Each structure stands twice: as structure tokens, then as C-alpha cells.
A protein has these predicted regions:
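An N-terminal assembly and electron-transfer interface module characteristic of large anaerobic redox
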Residues: 1-167
Length: 167
């Protein structure tokens, strides 16, 4: 919604832009309210293997918070150089209090959570429910609602069967 406010400033229509922001936020909270009966309290892990210049975790973490999901950990895959790892740790820490752990430390955790959101397919474990986070995220209110719906539907799938869903 930041872009709406910026557009309002550019067009000298701040009040109108703020009205649009409120409408968009109402849509997000209304949808989140519908699916929270399933998402609330569910345990998840976010696995990240992309550099910060290609993946910004803030939107994902904000959506998980809106759905009242419990982020057990952020797992950073082993493909980071020290500089890129530091940048991602700073970006994640600014948004989330969950522990940030490496791939090895997170292996067992993957099997105990309700959902794994990941930038890279985890192919060595077919039992976990995964949502693949694309390079280009869905945008806008409709994009976030589509992402929340994907989380909801993945959590609603019957049984313990894993698999991967592409947003």
C-alpha cells in the first residue's frame, strides 16, 4: 500500500490515496479473518536461499503475521557467502524474532512443522508440505490474498502427505 500513498503524493491526492489504502487493508484483513480458523497458531518455517537483491522476506513474514502463524525459524540455505548471509540476517531480523538457523540445524525442524515456505524446492523429503516462493512475488492486495489462499488450501489438504505447491 506504500505505492498508493506515493501515488497520492505525486498526484496531490493524499486524502483519496489514504481512502484507497484503507479499502485495500480492509480487503486483506477480511480475507485473513476468513482463513485464520485454519492458519492461526500453525507452525511454519521459512527457508531462504536467494540473495537479498532477489528476494525480500518482509512481505512473506508480514503475511504470516497477518495469518497469525507461528514462524518457528528462518532457515538460511548454505549457498550464501558471508556478506550476503549478513545482509539477509539483517533483513529477516528487522521483520521477525524467529531464530535464524542454517540448513543442517533446520533439517529435523522441517519434519515437525505444519508448513514450509521455501525459495528452493526441498527434494530430499517428500513428507513435508511446501509452498515454493517465486522469484517475482505476487503483487498488490489481490496477490497477497492469492498467497494467503494458497497457504490456507495447503494447510487444509487431508492427511500427512507432503508435496510442493507453486504460488
Amino acid at each position: 500500500v506504500g505505492w498508493l500513498r506515493n501515488l497520492g503524493v505525486f498526484l496531490h491526492q493524499e486524502a483519496l490515496a489514504e481512502k484507497a489504502v484503507v479499502q485495500e487493508m480492509d480487503k486483506l484483513f477480511a480475507f485473513a479473518g476468513k482463513v485464520k480458523k485454519i492458519t492461526q497458531g500453525k507452525r511454519c518455517v521459512v527457508c531462504i536461499g536467494r540473495m537479498l537483491m532477489y528476494f525480500h522476506p518482509a512481505g512473506i513474514l508480514e503475511t504470516l503475521s497477518r495469518l497469525e502463524m507461528q514462524v518457528e525459524a528462518i532457515i538460511l540455505f548454505d549457498n550464501y557467502n558471508p556478506k550476503e548471509r549478513k545482509l539477509m540476517v539483517e533483513a529477516v531480523s528487522a521483520q521477525c524474532q524467529a531464530p535464524i538457523i542454517d540448513q543442517t540445524a533446520g533439517q529435523q525442524l522441517l519434519e515437525t512443522v505444519d508448513l514450509v515456505l521455501t525459495t528452493h524446492e526441498i527434494t530430499n523429503n517428500q513428507d513435508i508440505k511446501q509452498i515454493f516462493l517465486p522469484m517475482l512475488p505476487l503483487v498488490g492486495t489481490s496477490g497477497e490474498i492469492e498467497f494467503m489462499d494458497c497457504i490456507y488450501k495447503t494447510l487444509c489438504r487431508r492427511g500427512e502427505k507432503g508435496g510442493i505447491v507453486y504460488v
